[in-house]
Regions:
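Short, intrinsically disordered, charge-biased short linear motifs at domain edges
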Residues: 22-35, 66-81, 227-229, 359-363
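Cysteine-centered iron-sulfur cluster-binding motifs in ferredoxin-type domains/subunits
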Residues: 31-51, 75-102, 111, 134-141, ...
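Iron-sulfur cluster-binding electron-transfer modules in prokaryotic oxidoreductases
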Residues: 102-447
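A generic structural-conservation signal
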Residues: 47, 57, 90-91, 235, ...
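Conserved oxyanion/phosphate-binding beta-strand-loop segments in alpha/beta enzyme cores
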Residues: 1-8, 45-50, 179-195
Length: 447
């Protein structure tokens, strides 16, 4: 047997509807097998807290072997995994097609699904993962202002700590006064659709919960870039949460319901020749990877997968097609750019970095790229139990992002961006300005 893979990793479909998937004994046996291999390798120790937790458990046994770890302690490892997928995509030498067939993230997902089925996921965690529920207040006059103001008070944060398990010091997004999908044209078809070799000539925007409820400006910036490049677009006429927060809980039935709400709508756009673009990497990843692996035989799901683009994957491909304008006018100066985990594991390359370098051919851009997990990881970074760990994981990123006192810090993941800004401020190296990459490209165009 060869030591490690010489081939690109492949992913097996998630056999989540097989009764054995939820069999705890079977899952624990597989965890012991995988943990034993991980213990003998330890390449992933610098990623999330799952691996230090596992290795500490092993090292505390009498003989330093996995068989000495009590099975009930395995769940400590599971709880620290936030499904970033970096171990699978960037570190593990034993992923399929290797004979050892390791898929650590999906094994952790299986364990989380077992916990969820057993009723061991708290109501607090379920509420935090219900983005459409707490986003429902967005855009309601007076209510938005009241909720945002209250959530900034120490009293409210103490209540959120006890009632919702949200750490008092964790950054929390505010609700938007105007939702992205409200009070605006839902399409611009004034331009003809010009297909390129690599890109469809028209775009369907999946707005995402975060852009719709929290930072609609990111969506507006995307639209400005499409308009400037004369690319017709539509905002998809109906959407629900992509399901990523529920996936992180192991609530696969809720993910399936999200799929049933979204895929028929998105498949129509895919079949009509649209590129489907989402400005949140986790949402893009759900439609590119996780939902297709859960429903490998669903033709509509596979059609959506093929049509789904990260924004800069689309714009860079558009440039290679000779169909992107490069009339940049405004220098960006020093930019510290963070590549988020769920952007990296899409296996599309560093497309946002490529875009910044393209801008730098016309105007000044001094780019500092940081390629490491920020530690935020969706709801993980705001939870009382994990926020201090999330800040610890992010420390190398906070330090690297502060290099050369950048004019802007930026991340494709807006949540990671705010987490990094908080960490930099706590380290005494506060960022001058936090801007999403789409916002910076809009600035560079002078729009």
């Amino acid at each position: 047997m060869r030591e490690g893979n010489l081939e690109a990793p492949t992913r097996h479909p998630l056999d989540w509807q097989n009764p054995e998937f939820h069999d705890e004994g079977s899952a624990l046996k597989e965890m012991e097998r995988v943990f034993d291999i991980c213990h003998g390798c330890r390449r992933c120790v610098s990623l999330c807290q799952s691996f230090p937790t596992l290795f500490d458990l092993v090292d505390a046994t009498d003989d330093g072997e996995v068989h000495g770890v009590k099975k009930e302690a395995y769940w400590k490892v599971v709880d620290q995994c936030y499904l970033c997928d970096l171990c699978y995509m960037t570190k593990c030498p034993y992923t399929p097609p290797h004979a050892w067939n390791l898929d650590f993230p999906h094994l952790m997902l299986r364990a989380k699904a077992i916990k969820h089925q057993k009723g061991e996921v708290s109501a607090k965690e379920k509420f935090l993962a219900s983005t459409d529920t707490h986003g429902s207040f967005a855009g309601i006059p007076i209510v938005v202002q009241a909720v945002n103001a209250i959530n900034k008070t120490k009293t409210a944060r103490k209540v959120m700590d006890s009632a919702l398990g949200v750490h008092p010091d964790a950054w929390m997004p505010t609700l938007a006064a105007q939702r992205f999908r409200w009070g605006r044209a839902m399409s611009n078809t004034a331009f003809p659709a010009v297909n390129g070799q690599r890109t469809p000539g028209k775009v369907a925007i999946f707005s995402t919960c975060y852009v719709n409820y929290n930072e609609p400006g990111i969506g507006e910036d995307l639209i400005k870039l499409l308009d400037h490049n004369e690319i017709p677009y539509v905002i998809v006429d109906k959407e629900s949460c992509c399901g990523m927060p529920k996936l992180e809980l192991g609530d696969l039935q809720s993910v399936a319901r999200s799929k049933e709400a979204n895929i028929p709508v998105l498949a129509r756009y895919a079949q009509e020749g649209y590129a489907i673009v989402s400005a949140v990497p986790s949402c893009t990843l759900m439609f590119k990877q996780e939902i297709p692996l859960m429903f490998p035989d669903c033709a509509d799901t596979q059609a959506v997968k093929k049509a789904m683009f990260d924004p800069f994957e689309y714009f860079v491909a558009r440039h290679k097609d000779g169909l992107l304008k490069t009339d940049f006018k405004a220098a960006l100066g020093k930019v510290s750019y963070h590549i988020p985990c769920h952007g990296r594991v899409q296996n599309i390359g560093k497309k946002t970095e490529e875009m910044f370098k393209l801008i730098g051919q016309t105007v000044e851009v001094k780019l500092n790229t940081v390629e490491r997990c920020s530690g935020h990881a969706g709801t993980y970074g705001v939870k009382t139990a994990y926020h201090p760990v999330a800040m610890k994981i992010g420390k190398p990123v906070f330090k690297a992002m502060a290099k050369d006192e950048p004019d802007f810090i930026s991340s494709d993941c807006a949540l990671a961006g705010h987490h990094i800004a908080q960490g930099m401020a706590q380290a005494g190296t506060p960022a001058k300005a936090l801007q999403h990459p789409l916002s910076l490209v809009r600035r560079a165009y002078g729009l």
